Amino acid sequence: MTRSIFIHTLLALSALTSVHGANSPGCGKNPTLANGVHQINGREYTLKIPDDYDANNPYHLIFGLHWRGGNMDNVVSGDSIQPWYGLESRAQGSAIFIAPNGLNAGWANTNGEDVAFIDAIMEQVESDLCVDQSSRFATGFSWGGGMSYSLACSRAKEFRAVSVLSGGVISGCDGGNDPIAYLGIHGINDPVLPFDGGVELAERFVGNNGCQPASIEKPQSGSNGWKRTDFYGCSKPVSFIAYDGGHDGAPLGVQSSLAPDATWEFFMAA
């Protein structure tokens, strides 16, 4: 093998590792970031690091995105939802959590500015903390769900999976042709972002992931129940949960484990 070919081979392998998962540059370093609010490019996000953080252990990285009219504090405190969408308690110290603050209490993502914000947060956090770069996730409700969907469209190679709660195409979909593990959760009587729209979001990734088409199962209205549809033949998993409810950050109620359990288990299996 010539020196030129050898060097090009090493560069190709390095690029492959960066796309498909390596430990972040922050692994092995003494961190300078701490729990709390941080700023980057004039915007804010809240960071939650496990109490027993180990700089030599790569962690999952999970973004929790707030809804319209909300903010990062609502995600952290659990205002109308379980804190961190119920995922921090299920992670049991295995994940670093980030709650970014949207502009004007939302995620319009004008000219991709919110995706760029997420990119900048990842770069800042991963340069300082130890992250498994193949294990990044995003979830959110309503506009936060729309932003999670937007990340699925434009950052499918950077994120492993998303969970979209009552989302819509309200933060754009730049790209939208790559496969990514996708979980949709939507109320059948949603008066804000209609149920059929939520189904259409999932169907994009049914196609991208090469899944076998299937009809979405729905519970009876008034049943207080839910139905899950898992698609088969997919290169990356796609599932959809239809529940008897409206536009809810906590499907079937704040005390319900439906969305937190489904999201956590989906992320870990993706």
Swiss-Prot record:
Residues 1-21 form the signal peptide. Gene3D superfamilies: alpha/beta hydrolase. Keywords: Carbohydrate metabolism, Hydrolase, Polysaccharide degradation, Secreted, Serine esterase, Signal, Xylan degradation. It is an enzyme of class 3 (hydrolase). It catalyses: feruloyl-polysaccharide + H2O = ferulate + polysaccharide. It is found in: Secreted. One of its GO terms (cellular component) is extracellular region. It comes from the Eukaryota. Its main location: secreted. PANTHER family: FERULOYL ESTERASE C, PTHR38050. This is Probable feruloyl esterase C.
